[in-house]
């Protein structure tokens, strides 16, 4: 039975470690524009990072506060919102991240 089961990947750790790992991977992704990680972590990160980009495209104050709450870094959020204001993701309605297999 499916009582009290949360959706999403566990990634072999407890919930707090998974949350911290997604947060640090998202920060690294937005700082460096690309990261190298496992495929499973990349798939989990995609669902964490793409709403932040959608909020940045909206550009209003509520979206900015949501992004700060999710990432915890005001300067990084300001950079993301500046990129979105310059039209970095203007031509896409979703699917901002791409997972490429190496090796």
State where each predicted segment sits.
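Basic, ligand-binding patches in group-transfer machinery
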Residues: 21
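Structured, basic alpha/beta domains of bacterial-type, RNA-associated proteins
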Residues: 1-13, 24-103
């Amino acid at each position: 039975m499916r009582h009290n089961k949360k959706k999403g990947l566990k990634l072999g750790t407890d919930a707090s470690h998974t949350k911290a790992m997604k947060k640090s991977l998202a920060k690294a992704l937005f700082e460096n524009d690309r990261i190298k990680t496992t495929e499973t972590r990349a798939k989990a990160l995609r669902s964490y990072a793409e709403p932040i980009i959608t909020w940045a495209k909206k550009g209003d104050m509520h979206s900015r506060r949501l992004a700060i709450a999710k990432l915890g870094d005001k300067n990084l959020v300001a950079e993301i919102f500046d990129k979105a204001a310059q039209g970095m993701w203007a031509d896409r309605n979703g699917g901002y991240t791409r997972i490429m297999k190496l090796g």
